[in-house]
């Protein structure tokens, strides 16, 4: 966890509480080149520092450079596509608005409970309505909704409008694996199955890594054509900002343009049976040169497999 990493990088601090004077004594035990120092501060102040530090790292834990779920993560994964960049900033914008509304309503509720309780206000006021208040609580929410709607529709339009495509990948969901086809490269196709615990290698991620990843070049506009061969699935990769249902007999599409090299993980996000939780998605983003080399290797492997099958017959 990032909190543990953070504390391990700091000078080790020995905490000694003086119960008699309610103070805290810190002794910094640093490396051989550092100087030790001792100082005392009120215990409550030090506890607040610890609480604030813990809250900070819990909130910002998921903002490290990772393309996968993390322990204690409570925000989005770092965005790696233009759509996800917009969604990420829009989410933060909504968070400010929502927080302000919650604080205002909670404060107003607290004020009313204290100011107009039976003790402070033994004779309650009796009135049917107040025109000014009714106008305020109608107009202000409308303004807030308009402020939210404008960027929301802009992002929806951006996501729905598919630009000029450089690469197309067909995605077919099955119980419980994915099948990928590259129609631009002689219909190169392969299955992608989660690596089981017994076959997991060092460095591979449990429940996320697969035997065959989708490989795409960076800074390339990729279109995904998504369907299913049995039941409804959902093709979702959070860090790329898309979640598209895979429906039998229907083709849905989405697009992405990944700006950072790396491996981005997703999962089937529609309950599809007993092994629904074991349908991970892994998209590896590489340079265009590495992508061409990967395509050549895959095609060569496919040709060898076909030759082997023909020879066996």
Swiss-Prot record:
Cofactors, names only: Cu cation; heme
Keyword set includes Cell wall biogenesis/degradation: no
Cell location: Cell membrane
GO biological process: ATP synthesis coupled electron transport
InterPro entries associated with the record: CcO_II, CcO_II-like_C, CcO_II_C, Copper_CuA, Cupredoxin, Cyt_c_oxidase_su2, Cyt_c_oxidase_su2_TM_dom, Cyt_c_oxidase_su2_TM_sf
Disulphide linkage map: none
RPE1 insert domain ranges (all copies): 5-51
A Pfam family hit: COX2_TM
Record's catalysed reaction(s): 4 Fe(II)-[cytochrome c] + O2 + 8 H(+)(in) = 4 Fe(III)-[cytochrome c] + 2 H2O + 4 H(+)(out)
Class of enzymatic activity (EC top level): translocase
Membrane topology: Multi-pass membrane protein
Bound cofactor: record note: Binds a copper A center.
Binding site for Cu cation: 233, 268, 272, 276
Entry keywords, A to Z: Cell membrane, Copper, Electron transport, Heme, Iron, Membrane, Metal-binding, Respiratory chain, Translocase, Transmembrane, Transmembrane helix, Transport
A molecular-function term among this protein's GO annotations: copper ion binding
Entry's transmembrane regions: 39-59, 94-114, 131-151
PROSITE patterns in the record: COX2, COX2_CUA, COX2_TM
Chief location: membrane
Role: Subunits I and II form the functional core of the enzyme complex. Electrons originating in cytochrome c are transferred via heme a and Cu(A) to the binuclear center formed by heme a3 and Cu(B).
Family: Belongs to the cytochrome c oxidase subunit 2 family.
PANTHER family assigned to the protein according to its UniProt record, in alphabetical order: CYTOCHROME C OXIDASE SUBUNIT 2 (PTHR22888:SF9), CYTOCHROME C OXIDASE, SUBUNIT II (PTHR22888)
Protein name, as recorded: Probable cytochrome c oxidase subunit 2
């Amino acid at each position: 966890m990032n909190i543990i990493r953070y504390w391990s990088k700091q000078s080790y601090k020995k905490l000694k509480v003086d119960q008699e004077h309610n103070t805290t004594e810190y002794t910094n035990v640093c490396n051989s080149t550092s100087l030790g120092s001792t100082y005392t501060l009120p215990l409550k102040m030090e506890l607040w520092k610890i609480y604030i530090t813990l809250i900070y790292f819990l909130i910002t834990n998921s903002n490290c450079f990772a393309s996968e779920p993390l322990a204690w993560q409570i925000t989005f994964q770092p965005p790696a596509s233009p759509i996800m960049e917009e969604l990420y900033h829009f989410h933060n914008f909504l968070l400010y608005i929502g927080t302000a509304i919650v604080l205002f309503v909670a404060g107003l509720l607290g004020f009313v409970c204290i100011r107009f309780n039976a003790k402070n206000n033994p004779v309650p006021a009796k009135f049917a309505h107040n025109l000014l208040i009714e106008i305020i609580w109608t107009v202000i929410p409308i303004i807030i909704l308009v402020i939210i709607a404008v960027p929301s529709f802009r992002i929806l339009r951006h996501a729905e409008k598919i630009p000029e495509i450089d690469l197309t990948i067909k995605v077919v969901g099955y119980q419980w694996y994915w099948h990928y086809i590259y129609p631009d490269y002689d219909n190169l196709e392969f299955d992608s199955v989660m690596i089981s615990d017994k076959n997991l290698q060092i460095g591979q991620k449990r429940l996320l890594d697969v035997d065959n990843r989708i490989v795409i070049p960076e800074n390339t506009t990729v279109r995904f054509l998504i369907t299913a061969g049995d039941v409804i699935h959902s093709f979702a990769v959070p860090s790329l900002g898309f979640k598209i249902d895979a429906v039998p007999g229907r083709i849905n599409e989405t697009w992405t343009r990944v700006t950072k090299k790396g491996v981005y993980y997703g999962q089937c996000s529609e309950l599809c049976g007993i092994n629904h939780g074991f349908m991970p998605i892994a998209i590896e983003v590489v340079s265009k040169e590495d992508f061409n080399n990967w395509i050549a290797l895959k095609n060569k492997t496919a040709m060898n497999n076909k030759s082997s099958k023909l020879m066996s017959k």
